[in-house]
């Protein structure tokens, strides 16, 4: 293989954890938290300040509650499934492998579920959802490079609660909070922060459901009725990192800046794919192509061994790390296009 004369400044194109902001360094983090008791007033106030910043930056309604979960987004979504769901039939929208995973978790609990699934690059039917059902969906699926686009399809007279995994869309897409009752995400995607902590955002309707389910048997670590902000000991270094990345995001210009940055990044890859004859987008309709992750299939049949050699070469030469397709998805290329990625590195 021919070594390129020009290389990327950063070869980090993983879809999570993602590349750090360029200005990030360990020395830039506040270390005054380390060694402090996590339930002390000092730390409690620090967490409150971060959550308030988060709500302001993301325009989360003031009457929505923000909670911390262990186990990143996975822990957050399990907390929601166990604590909030089960009373009503659930319409699950599945177009990526994470949505399928969460649907299988719902099945294990024997909740009533209407499954609308498509894993072939097409979006399942979104309209005519029973208003009394709960709704469950992933906003952006990095395993398929697809996104729900918007949630205008959710009925205005929806009496069931709406649950969404927004990990790969928050900070990049315009989230319609008023239509979401339980939204979960982690820190390690759009803003390049550290993993292992999940955020849960609950609407007043979700909080009412939580009260209704108060007597439900739920494992302590994921019981949302059993916490105010945090349930176990968080990493205070990760909190400091999160605050740094939030500040970086805000100073760059927030959502308007990030949304444009992602669109510009994706456009670079779209033009690249259109100009070659060996790759194509997995997502069939352009409007469902994700802002944060692009996923491409090979048009012609290729041998996995040969493609693995290419991936190894790109990694060895520090050109591109971690661009293999998701492990359950068809063989292809998956590249993160979030706001920490530089356009010139994609070029």
Range-by-range predicted roles:
Residues 1-41:
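N-terminal "arm"/small-domain region of PLP-dependent enzymes with the aminotransferase-like
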Residues 27-79, 83, 95-105:
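Conserved N-terminal alpha-helix of the aminotransferase class I/II PLP-enzyme fold
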Residues 75, 82-135:
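PLP-dependent aminotransferase-like
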Residues 120-171, 182:
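Active-site phosphate-binding strand-loop segment of PLP-dependent enzymes
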Residues 177-188, 198:
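Conserved active-site segment immediately N-terminal to the catalytic lysine
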Residues 188-272:
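Active-site C-terminal subdomain of aminotransferase-like
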Residues 274, 278-344:
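Conserved C-terminal alpha-helix-loop-beta "cap" of PLP-dependent enzymes
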């Amino acid at each position: 293989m021919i070594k390129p004369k020009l290389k990327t400044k950063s070869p980090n194109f993983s879809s999570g954890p993602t590349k750090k902001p360029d200005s990030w360094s360990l020395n830039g983090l506040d270390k005054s938290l380390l060694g402090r008791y996590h339930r002390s007033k000092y730390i409690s106030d620090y967490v409150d300040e971060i959550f308030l910043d988060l709500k302001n930056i993301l325009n989360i309604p003031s009457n929505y509650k923000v909670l911390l979960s262990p186990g990143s987004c996975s822990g957050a979504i399990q907390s929601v499934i166990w604590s909030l769901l089960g009373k009503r039939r659930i319409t699950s929208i599945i177009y990526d492998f994470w949505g399928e995973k969460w649907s299988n978790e719902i099945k294990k609990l024997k909740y009533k579920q209407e499954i609308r699934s498509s894993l072939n690059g097409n979006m399942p039917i979104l309209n005519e959802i029973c208003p009394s059902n709960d709704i469950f969906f992933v906003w952006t699926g990095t395993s398929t490079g697809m996104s729900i686009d918007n949630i205008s399809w959710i009925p205005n007279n929806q009496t069931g609660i709406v649950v969404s995994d927004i990990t790969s869309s928050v900070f990049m897409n315009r989230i319609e909070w008023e239509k979401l009752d339980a939204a979960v995400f982690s820190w390690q995607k759009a803003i390049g922060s550290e993993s292992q902590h999940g955020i849960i955002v609950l609407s007043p309707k979700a909080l009412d459901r939580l009260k209704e389910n108060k007597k439900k048997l739920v494992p302590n670590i994921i019981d949302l009725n059993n916490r105010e902000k945090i349930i176990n000991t968080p990493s205070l270094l990760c909190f400091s990192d999160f605050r740094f990345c939030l500040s970086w995001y805000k100073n760059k210009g927030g959502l308007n800046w990030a949304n444009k940055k992602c669109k510009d990044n994706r456009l670079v890859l779209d033009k690249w794919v259109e100009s070659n004859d060996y790759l194509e987008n997995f997502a069939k309709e352009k409007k469902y192509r994700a802002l944060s992750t692009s996923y491409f299939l090979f048009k012609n049949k290729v041998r996995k061994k040969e493609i693995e050699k290419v991936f190894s070469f790109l990694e060895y030469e520090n050109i591109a790390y971690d661009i293999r397709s998701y492990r359950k998805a068809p063989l292809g290329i998956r590249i993160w296009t979030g706001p920490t990625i530089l356009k010139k590195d994609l070029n």
